[in-house]
Amino acid sequence: VDPAPPRDENDIFSLKSTLCDESARMFLRMRALFSLRNIGGKDAVDALAAAFESDSALLKHEIAYVMGQMQDSAAVPHLIDRLADGDEDVMVRHEAAEALGAIGDRTALATLEEFVDDDAVVVAESCEVALDLLEYVSSKRLNYAD
């Protein structure tokens, strides 16, 4: 169960506007977040990524989480940026790592390997889990294609 129900709206621009509005209640921002996840596709991913500029670590953590759920490779560069940013909250970095694993795009492999020894234990452990998950997800896709 999501922390907030998605809105009954498919206008990516409007949803992005709500998601990025720092003065909006978190519940409304979360509703926009889950609506964008449900819409899917590169435009929705880009709208979600725009909110990585938020001051809220909770929101950014949820953004990374839903990007992992979406399993869209368009999210990979955005998630790599969050993971690689040593100034980012560890909760966000941890979720970015796990989302990269869930997406299963091998372009994230080198970044996950780089941060498997991160000083933040939760980030390092998340990268370790993500590496195994990435291998699993990418091998399932390869086997499915055969």
Q: Where in the sequence are the language-model features?
A:
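Helix-adjacent hinge/juxtasegments
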Residues: 55-74
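Amphipathic alpha-helical scaffolding segments comprising HEAT/armadillo-like alpha-solenoid repeats
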Residues: 5-20, 41-53, 72-85, 105-117, ...
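Boundary/linker segments of alpha-helical solenoid repeat arrays
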Residues: 91, 120-129, 142
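Short inter-helical turns and helix N-cap capping residues of alpha-solenoid HEAT/ARM repeat scaffolds
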Residues: 23-25, 55-56, 87-89, 119-120
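Core register positions within helices of long alpha-helical scaffolds
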Residues: 2, 35-38, 66-69, 99-102, ...
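Short, solvent-exposed interaction modules
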Residues: 69, 83-103
